[in-house]
Amino acid sequence: MSFRALTMRSAVARTALNNTIRSARVATPYLGIRHSSSTPTPDPKTKAASLIDALPGNTALTKTGILGTSAAAIIYGISNQLYVINDESILLLIFLGFSGLVAKFLAPLYKDFADARIKKIGSILNSSRERHVDAVKDRIESVSELQNVSETTKVLFDVSKETVELEAKAFELKQKVELAHEAKSVLDSWVRYEASLRQLQQKQIAEGIISKVESELTNPKFQDRVLQQSIAEVEQVLANIK
């Protein structure tokens, strides 16, 4: 019973495989005609080499072993009806082929874009790091210049203290000068007052003497006495001359 089932399965698998091969043979000339009409037919050796290179593995033996094992597994699965080719299988193959094409053609472009992006970001980070390092160095230099800030502050404090003392002395001298100037002005005003008072007194004395002399000159007795004295002096002079 089991042998008959295996025989029937083998017959069904051979029939399905023959139908697939026949349909592939029918479709192959049509595809070949369309391909030849649009582009020249590529070299089979080159195409086979590209397919082998697309397989995973490092050596040709490994890639050939993977290809043979995969083909044997597919044939075994189809012959034992473990896997039946249907519409979903065709869609899966088309999707896998499209994914392979995308991985083959778009992966290098994406790799170039990613490398350029990484390089740009790396350059930005490097420039930022260099600027940060320069800023830190400048800060260190500015701080190192202030390492003697205590001594400088002490000197500045001494200078400011001396400046305050000099300003205090200058203010004191200024006050003394202003006081002396004020005292001098007071003394000058007092001297001027005394001089004016003395002049007034002298004027009053002179006026008193002049008025007294004038009053005496108007006195007849004084005039007679002066006249007699003058006559006596003249007579004496004449006597001396003789």
UniProtKB/Swiss-Prot annotation:
Keywords tagged on the record: CF(0), Hydrogen ion transport, Ion transport, Membrane, Mitochondrion, Mitochondrion inner membrane, Transit peptide, Transport
Feature: transit peptide: 1-35
Claim: Mitochondrion is one of the keywords in the record: yes
GO molecular-function terms, A-Z: proton-transporting ATP synthase activity, rotational mechanism; proton-transporting ATPase activity, rotational mechanism
InterPro entries listed in its UniProt record: ATP_synth_Bsub_B/MI25, ATP_synth_F0_suB
Secretion signal, residue range per the UniProt entry: none
Source taxon at top rank: Eukaryota
Gene Ontology biological-process annotations: protein-containing complex assembly
One term under GO cellular component: proton-transporting ATP synthase complex
Cellular compartments annotated: Mitochondrion; Mitochondrion inner membrane
Keyword Transit peptide: yes
Family: Belongs to the eukaryotic ATPase B chain family.
Function description: Mitochondrial membrane ATP synthase (F(1)F(0) ATP synthase or Complex V) produces ATP from ADP in the presence of a proton gradient across the membrane which is generated by electron transport complexes of the respiratory chain. F-type ATPases consist of two structural domains, F(1) - containing the extramembraneous catalytic core, and F(0) - containing the membrane proton channel, linked together by a central stalk and a peripheral stalk. During catalysis, ATP synthesis in the catalytic domain of F(1) is coupled via a rotary mechanism of the central stalk subunits to proton translocation.
Quaternary assembly: F-type ATPases have 2 components, CF(1) - the catalytic core - and CF(0) - the membrane proton channel. In yeast, the dimeric form of ATP synthase consists of 17 polypeptides: alpha, beta, gamma, delta, epsilon, 4 (B), 5 (OSCP), 6 (A), 8, 9 (C), d, E (Tim11), f, g, h, i/j and k.
Entry protein name: ATP synthase subunit 4, mitochondrial
